[in-house]
Structure formats: C-alpha cells, structure tokens
From Swiss-Prot:
Membrane topology: Multi-pass membrane protein
HAMAP family: PlsY (MF_01043)
Reported function: Catalyzes the transfer of an acyl group from acyl-phosphate (acyl-PO(4)) to glycerol-3-phosphate (G3P) to form lysophosphatidic acid (LPA). This enzyme utilizes acyl-phosphate as fatty acyl donor, but not acyl-CoA or acyl-ACP.
Protein name per its UniProtKB record: Glycerol-3-phosphate acyltransferase
Lineage, top ranks: Bacteria, Bacillati, Bacillota, Bacilli, Lactobacillales
Gene transcribed to yield this protein: plsY
Amino acid sequence: MITIVLLILAYLLGSIPSGLWIGQVFFQINLREHGSGNTGTTNTFRILGKKAGMATFVIDFFKGTLATLLPIIFHLQGVSPLIFGLLAVIGHTFPIFAGFKGGKAVATSAGVIFGFAPIFCLYLAIIFFGALYLGSMISLSSVTASIAAVIGVLLFPLFGFILSNYDFLFIAIILALASLIIIRHKDNIARIKNKTENLVPWGLNLTHQDPKK
C-alpha cells in the first residue's frame, strides 16, 4: 500500500506547475499566453525575469530529486528510485494540476538523474553549459545534453568512468528521458534549422541564429 501511495505522490510532485503558478500568483500573468507558451524555466526567465526563472528551475529540479529519493526516505524495498523519478517527469510533462499540459521535462529529468547518479548529472551539466556557451540556446543545450546522456550511459561503464557498471533500468530511463526531451523540442529544432531560434544574452551564438528574422 505504501508503495502505491508513494508512486502517486511522485507523480503529484512532478505535477506541480511551478512556472505557471508563480506567474499567476505573483505576476498575474498566464505563461501560456506569452512567449513560447511553455510553463518551464526558459519561458519563465524570458517573461517573468531572473528571480522567477531561477525559482522555477529550482522547484522543477528538486521535485525530480525528491521523487527519486522517496523510496530511500521511507526505506522502501523492491522498487527502483528511478521508477519514482520517471513518474515525476511524467507528472511534469502531463500535470494533473494544469490540464495535463506541462513543460519540456529538462529540469525535472536533471533532478531525477541528480538524485540517482549525481556525478553523471555533473557530467551532463558540464555538457549543457558548454553547449550553451557555444550556441547561446537553451534548446540546443538541452538536446545536446540528452544525446550526451545516452552516449555516456552506454559507454562509461565500459571504462569504469563515472558509471562503474551497466544498470539496464538506468539505461532504459535515460533513453526514455532523452527521447522525451528531444521530441518536446521538435519546434525548437525546426527553428534552429531555420536559424530563428531564441537566444540567451550570453555565449558565442556560433550557429548565427537571428530570432528577429
């Protein structure tokens, strides 16, 4: 019974639409009607500012971490923490508290990985911010980190680097999360190809995007 309750709790944690609620409560703004219409970290930064964007990121990240740690906190045996983390990501993507229309799952997925394999998460953070500096695009960085996650989870155990052995559930979860993130960024990928993707005011913009075109 406790397992079912905690699995539901993991989904409900993921379903907290932090950006949407922050916009509505503190700014009287519905993020779905502004910018990209997304309720995640990037659009929150763009529309509501740095403080709101950072708050959204922190909440979205750590709800994934907390969900992953639920079975450890409650000394639950028999169900991998990754299942709880996956349910949090599903909740974030299809939140019951926001009409099942959620974000792109980047921050929450990162939080899940941090809760299960923190050094692997650090590796992905380095890839993410490296790509962000080179390309000046959150979307490109997210997709690049997703691909790097798949490469890492498949290759690192071969050399005992970061990941000491193969965990086939972790591989499956990484493949699922990476696929979800890339699919959720399909519109961004199209804009990148057309060189019209939105930029952050930092980095080299090596692909010469011009969102004003």
